[in-house]
């Protein structure tokens, strides 16, 4: 970022704009706001009069119209200036000195700027702002107008620096000559466009302020001598000019900020060529790293490469005719180029993306195949990382072009390189539904006979050294087996996943599972209903009975598709109860349970009153999904930019900190979230593994944490051994994506809730109120914005309590570590942390501390520009580095 304080140096070599006129004859005026002579040509390498054109003439100037022969992109880069007849106060410097000095400088400064009778007197080291009629000693030095403002600000800044020795005041003292400016920066014309519509000239609002300033400049120059002699006329011109300059700066800041601003809309915005979109369908014959694109899409995306190949084969001589033939093939779906397409895409890769991209697994790389169908075909097991299904979901296709990007996709973005979730190190390509059902049927003995044993066949798929499976394999057990194979035999997991896929589909097809309405009719239903509801009106007891083992056992023995639920392939016992036995109790908007149950089941049908009561509870889920998805997404976005600059060191193994985070481990689920972390055990560091994590249940452990890491980039010991599977050093973004993805999925999942009331196992009557997912989302947002007197341990604990416990504890710690600051420095990096109490910044304000670009585009632009002035050149945020072309 340039040094904003050095205003005069920036304007030093800029061309001046002197004319308020826009046009001269049919061209832009040579000295106006859109001059081709100042800002560059409108057409590439073509001068204004047309005498010179072509790239061969670049660098020179036309001898007739004096326009430089250059690329028209120069009109987005070249600045100019307006020279003012009298100096005015730099609005940015004014805001800065007032924010640092407060009322002590604001009152006298405003007095000198607005009151024409105000005069500055200096006696020794003291300054006084007085009116003409006040008595002042003759020994005092008198200053008026701009000189008075300059002397006041300079003496005040020097005094504050001597008293406080603050670096901010030092920067002001060194750049105090920029407080009064005689030049206004003019933005490049393409950033403030002007177009003609009929007889009207439509232009950006910023241009109107430039025109006002130029007009007042001309008026003042016409009466310059009078303005110098008459103080009231001088102040009238000064106030009007100062007002226009201030409004101009505010408009420029507005143009930078917000979603449509230059930073988010243009600089940080994505512009993607060579892309497409289509509906996805499963293709079991593919390998994990393969996808099939439609023939017409491949022709369109690889149009130039296909054209080059058919020209090389001698079928066409010129590019336009080859492209014309390709366009006809696309229009009429002609297959004459199918073979050439297949040759063209050899060695090419693509990136598939399904929106919403909640985490990095939402964009994965694939090798390309081509088919004549109009859909994208993918491997069935990639649904889990994309959170996709095959009910009409669409995916976008992006084609990397350069050799470096293609290699990066192969090394880091292929599915086989992302089998492990960054959230919890579990397998991402999980089998489900048909595959799970097929494996369940195979291992349950349904297909066994004298010549075939299902368990033996299943064991033959596993590595030879793996422990023999002797039990029926449902979804949980299958995932556990695959996870263990991934850990023990990492080179065999990809082949095993394909074998499991083929076997599961084959045996689920052989099972011939079909559904009929008659299959949901069960005998003796009335006896079970009487058992559930014959409790004298006790709702708690009825709810307890409806989910009891007796009812589930009854369904297992009488429901024809119990295997679907038992295997984990589809459905739940609560859904089966509603279909076959009774809809049960429903809850209202606030989670309170109605005292009147819906006795009928969904197969027999509901009465009118039962149907109304039934729909009453599920409306909340639909409304929550519609209203809160955006809120959750914005929370995720703020989390990303809060944690974007937190990175893992690839060279520092241990920072040597002596501080530990104390955590009470209450149960097995929480203990598993500390796998691969280093804890303090009798003055030594001990690593928690999958084998010994049960030892810490019920204990308060001291764990090495990113919150206390002394290294700028988090050291490997404080983060834990999980860094080996991340394939990335940007642990802050991974943590933010993990929490953001979980919160968004919570909101989306409310769409599927039916309003049916349930109670959790072990809950008492006090816990009967139904779970409020949106309330949890509000709680998270409140935690990350309002901190009161919380300690970091409490904040981590509260976040962990709200979120899904299937997320490693270190991700919560990474987020909290980014919220703790002392001034402009992270608390964890202070040399003596015990001397300072950390100040918690909200996730809205943390980007201000590290990235000027993010602060300008997401926060208050005026406040952010002040941070930018103070820290000019010192920001090291990821976005700032990208814009400067530095390596991140």
Locations of regions flagged by a protein language model:
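Conserved core architecture of multi-subunit DNA-directed RNA polymerases
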Residues: 1-740, 744-787, 801, 866
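Extended, low-charge hydrophobic alpha-helical regions
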Residues: 596, 789-888
């Amino acid at each position: 970022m340039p040094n904003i304080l050095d205003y005069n140096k920036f304007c030093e070599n800029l061309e001046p704009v002197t004319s308020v006129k826009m046009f001269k004859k049919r061209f832009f005026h040579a000295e106006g706001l859109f001059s081709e002579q100042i800002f560059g040509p409108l057409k590439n390498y073509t001068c204004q009069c047309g005498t010179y054109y072509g790239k061969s003439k670049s660098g020179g100037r036309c001898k007739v119209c004096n326009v430089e022969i250059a690329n028209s992109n120069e009109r987005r880069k070249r600045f100019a200036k307006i020279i003012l007849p009298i100096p005015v106060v730099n609005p940015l410097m004014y805001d800065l000195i007032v924010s640092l000095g407060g009322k002590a400088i604001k009152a006298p400064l405003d007095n000198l700027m607005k009151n024409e009778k105000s005069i500055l007197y200096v006696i020794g080291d003291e300054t006084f702002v007085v009116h003409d009629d006040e008595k002042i000693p003759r020994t005092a030095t008198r200053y008026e107008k701009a000189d008075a403002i300059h002397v006041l600000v300079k003496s005040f800044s020097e005094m504050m620096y001597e008293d406080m020795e603050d670096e901010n005041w030092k920067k002001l003292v060194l750049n105090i000559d920029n407080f009064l400016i005689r030049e206004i920066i003019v933005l490049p014309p393409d950033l403030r466009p002007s177009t003609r519509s009929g007889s009207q000239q439509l232009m950006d609002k910023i241009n109107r302020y430039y025109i006002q300033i130029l007009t007042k400049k001309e008026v003042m120059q016409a009466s310059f001598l009078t303005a110098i002699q008459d103080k009231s006329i001088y102040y009238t011109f000064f106030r009007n000019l100062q007002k226009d300059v201030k409004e101009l700066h505010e408009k420029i800041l507005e143009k930078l900020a917000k979603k449509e601003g230059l930073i988010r809309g243009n600089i940080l915005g994505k512009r993607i060529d060579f892309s497409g979109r289509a509906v996805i369908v499963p293709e079991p014959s593919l390998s994990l790293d393969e996808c099939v694109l439609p023939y017409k899409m491949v022709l369109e995306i690889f149009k130039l490469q296909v054209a080059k190949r058919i020209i090389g084969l001698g079928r066409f001589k010129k590019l336009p005719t080859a492209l014309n033939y390709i366009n006809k093939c696309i229009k009429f779906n002609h297959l004459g180029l199918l073979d050439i397409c297949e040759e063209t895409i050899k060695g090419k890769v693509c990136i598939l993306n399904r929106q919403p991209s909640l985490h990095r697994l939402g964009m994965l790389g694939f090798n390309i195949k081509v088919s004549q169908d109009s859909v994208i075909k993918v491997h069935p097991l990639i649904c889990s990382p994309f959170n996709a299904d095959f009910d009409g979901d669409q995916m976008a296709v992006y084609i990397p072009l350069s050799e470096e990007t293609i290699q990066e996709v192969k090394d880091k973005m292929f599915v086989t390189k992302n089998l492990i979730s960054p959230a919890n190190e579990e397998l991402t390509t999980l089998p489900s539904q048909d595959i799970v059902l097929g494996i369940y049927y195979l291992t349950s003995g349904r297909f066994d006979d004298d010549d075939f044993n299902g368990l033996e066949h299943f064991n033959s798929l596993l590595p030879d050294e793996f422990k023999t499976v002797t039990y029926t394999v449902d979804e949980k057990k299958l995932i556990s087996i695959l996870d263990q194979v991934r850990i023990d035999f990492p080179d065999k997991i990809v082949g095993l996943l394909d074998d499991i896929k083929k076997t599961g589909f084959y045996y689920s097809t052989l099972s011939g599972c079909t559904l009929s309405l008659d299959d949901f009719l069960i005998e003796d239903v009335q006896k079970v209903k009487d058992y559930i509801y014959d409790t004298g009106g006790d709702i708690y007891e009825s709810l307890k009975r409806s989910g009891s083992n007796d009812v589930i056992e009854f369904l297992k023995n009488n429901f024809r598709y119990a295997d679907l639920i038992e295997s984990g392939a589809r459905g739940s016992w609560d859904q089966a109860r509603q279909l076959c036995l009774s809809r049960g109790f429903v809850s209202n908007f606030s989670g309170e349970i109605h005292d009147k149950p819906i006795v009928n089941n969904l197969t027999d049908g509901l009465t009118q009153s039962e149907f109304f009561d039934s729909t009453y509870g599920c409306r909340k889920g639909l409304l929550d999904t519609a209203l809160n998805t955006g809120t959750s997404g914005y929370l995720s976005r703020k989390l990303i930019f809060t944690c974007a600059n937190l990175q893992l060191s690839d060279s520092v193994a241990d920072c040597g900190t002596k501080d530990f985070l104390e955590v009470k481990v209450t149960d097995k689920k929480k203990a598993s979230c500390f796998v691969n972390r280093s804890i303090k055990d009798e003055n030594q560091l001990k690593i928690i593994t999958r084998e010994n994590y049960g030892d810490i249940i019920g204990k308060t452990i001291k764990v090495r944490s990113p919150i206390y890491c002394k290294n700028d980039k988090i050291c490997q010991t404080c983060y834990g051994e999980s860094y080996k599977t991340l394939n990335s050093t940007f642990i802050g973004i991974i943590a933010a994506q993990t929490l953001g993805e979980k919160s968004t999925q919570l909101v989306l999942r409310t769409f599927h809730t039916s309003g049916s009331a349930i109670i959790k196992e072990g809950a008492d009557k006090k816990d009967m109120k139904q779970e409020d997912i949106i309330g949890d989302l509000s709680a998270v947002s409140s935690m990350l914005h309002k901190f009161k007197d919380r300690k970091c341990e409490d904040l981590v604990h509260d976040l962990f309590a709200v979120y899904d416990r299937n997320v490693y504890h270190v991700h919560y710690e990474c987020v909290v570590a980014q919220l703790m600051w002392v001034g402009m420095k992270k608390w964890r990096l202070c040399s003596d942390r015990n001397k300072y109490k950390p100040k918690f910044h909200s996730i809205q304000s943390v980007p201000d501390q590290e990235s000027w670009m993010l602060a300008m585009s997401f926060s208050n632009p005026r406040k952010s520009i002040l941070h930018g002035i103070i820290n000019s050149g010192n920001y090291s945020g990821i976005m700032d580095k990208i814009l400067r072309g530095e390596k991140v």
